[in-house]
A protein has these predicted regions:
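Anionic ligand-binding catalytic core segments
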Residues: 1-161, 165-280
Length: 280
């Protein structure tokens, strides 16, 4: 395949489109009305080391796990084919014979971060920024928190602000875009670490009651009212209860057995921590 794209990130990628006859073409940005599917073709990152292909292949399985747990994913999930991941795009649609393009803005942009390398961003700050732009902040906050809990459980440490975005849908609704770049980043030979953390987060020993207290304080300081605050800790406890069956779910979704065993202790620890969240 010739050409390149302006797709960000370190993984080699190509935008591609599929026509009505099933043929694939590079997407030069002017596919017009002949395109029926809009996809991203993603290849392993050589610098990720000997498990680069494992990371990419299990990204497809991780998406199945997220879908089963009720997180927002694309209607059709990524497919690992011939050493590459074919990912449905959520910013393009074919509707009534026309190509429709949707607006997308990264979390860094929403939060006003100009220099990510020189900025320490916390999840509380991200949520404050989201409150100013999404249509239903309460629902998006629950979605955002559950995504990060699953990041922790499954070892997706690559959580920088370009790996989460806001999507403007055709009806004008603004909400978190479907989950993307979600995989076992803990396997990466580059020793990727979590970039965005919670105020009060302590790796391995986090007291989520403290995290929630910090979040409530920050939202109050920002004059963001939450009508049903109790739903937040309830959501987290409920999600934690589901994590107890996560290893079995991972197996059913096709995650490698070795990855399941590597994540098992962290999953159990997080489930125990979330069960300790106080209820009022």
């Amino acid at each position: 395949m010739a050409g390149a794209t302006d797709t960000q990130g370190e993984a080699p990628k190509f935008w591609v489109v599929q026509d009505a006859n099933g043929g694939w073409h590079p997407d030069h940005g002017d596919a017009g009305d002949f395109a029926r599917r809009y996809m991203l073709l993603k290849f392993p990152v050589p610098e990720s080391g000997p498990r680069a292909t494992d990371i990419l292949r299990n990204e497809a399985a991780y998406q199945k796990v997220a879908q089963t747990l009720g997180l927002r994913v694309t209607p059709s999930l990524p497919e690992f084919i011939d050493g590459a991941l074919l990912i449905p795009r959520f910013d393009r649609r074919h509707i009534d014979g026309r190509e429709v393009r949707l607006g997308v803005e990264s979390i860094y942009s929403v939060a006003g971060v100009l220099d990510a390398a020189a900025t320490t961003l916390r999840h509380q700050e991200v949520l404050i920024a989201l409150a100013a732009c999404v249509t239903d902040f309460h629902e998006e906050m629950k979605e955002y928190i559950r995504r990060d809990l699953l990041n922790i459980a499954l070892g997706n440490r690559d959580n920088h602000g370009r790996n989460t975005a806001i999507l403007k849908d055709t009806d004008g609704t603004l909400r978190l875009a479907p989950l993307y770049d979600f995989g076992p980043a803990f396997l990466d030979a580059r020793a990727i670490s979590r970039v965005i953390r919670w105020e009060g987060e302590e790796p391995g020993t986090t007291n989520w009651n403290v995290v929630l207290e910090n979040l409530a304080t920050r939202l109050e300081e920002a004059e963001i009212a939450i009508a049903d605050w109790d739903a937040i800790p309830t959501t987290m406890r409920s999600f934690g209860a589901r994590l107890k069956d996560l290893p079995a779910l991972m197996r059913d979704c096709g995650v490698d057995a070795s990855i399941i065993e590597q994540r098992r202790s962290d999953i159990e620890r997080l489930a125990s921590q979330l069960a300790a969240i106080a209820s009022k």
